[in-house]
């Protein structure tokens, strides 16, 4: 009898937890900005203009490992010594994948010559479920007169969206490892649907 009560209670707790979990909620997702690294994945500066020192690369790596890496990287990129380094002209696309639903692609551009461009138009999706099938794939390029340079592709998982929703503000998700440090962060604003 005690086992039945415990099993019944544990089953009720599991159902109750599942019903209130973020995986059953719907949100609006907005990608606000990206933070781009100092160099392309091959180590050359954007548009092959300027010189990026080994010290700059090491300092950026240290900033990426800081407790609040997004702030440390933003402060690092604002250093006057980096003003002479060419910055990319970001353009790209973001595609939302939801299980078997058709992909929902959004294209955008960033401000020219910026290490941390806001995206225009900002990719937005409404009524996005926070479940394991949800992911967003982002592909970025440095727009050039001839032959755009690949900045990188990264994936935003459902768990990343849930963390952004929990933060309640623009959440800077570190994506540097996915892109070989060519793209460092992506800004996500995830809010509950009314």
List the model feature ranges, each with a label.
Residues 2-7:
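Sec-dependent signal peptide recognition
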Residues 15-16:
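C-terminal motif of bacterial Sec signal peptides marking the signal peptidase cleavage site
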Residues 20-91:
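C2/C2-like lipid-binding beta-sandwich modules
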Residues 26, 120-125, 135, 168-170, ...:
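Intrinsic-disorder/low-complexity, polar/charged segments enriched in Ser/Thr/Lys/Arg/Asp/Glu/Gln
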Residues 34-37, 143-194:
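C2-type phospholipid-binding modules
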Residues 78-163:
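Peripheral membrane lipid-binding modules
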């Amino acid at each position: 009898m005690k086992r039945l009560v415990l099993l019944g209670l544990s089953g009720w707790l599991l159902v109750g937890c599942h019903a209130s979990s973020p995986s059953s909620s719907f949100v609006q997702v907005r990608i606000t900005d990206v933070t781009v690294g100092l160099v392309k994945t091959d180590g050359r500066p954007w548009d092959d203009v300027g010189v990026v020192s080994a010290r700059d690369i090491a300092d950026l790596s240290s900033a990426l490992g800081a407790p609040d890496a997004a702030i440390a990287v933003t402060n690092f990129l604002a250093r006057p010594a980096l003003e002479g380094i060419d910055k990319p002209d970001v353009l790209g696309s973001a595609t939302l994948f939801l299980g078997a639903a058709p992909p929902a692609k959004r294209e955008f551009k960033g401000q020219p010559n910026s290490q941390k461009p806001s995206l225009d138009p900002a990719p937005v999706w409404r009524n996005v479920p926070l479940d394991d099938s949800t992911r967003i794939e982002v592909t970025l390029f440095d727009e050039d007169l001839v032959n755009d340079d690949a900045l990188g592709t990264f994936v935003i998982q459902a768990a990343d969206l849930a963390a952004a929703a929990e933060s309640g503000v623009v959440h800077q998700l570190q994506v540097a490892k996915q892109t070989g440090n060519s793209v460092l962060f992506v800004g996500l604003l995830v809010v509950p649907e009314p």
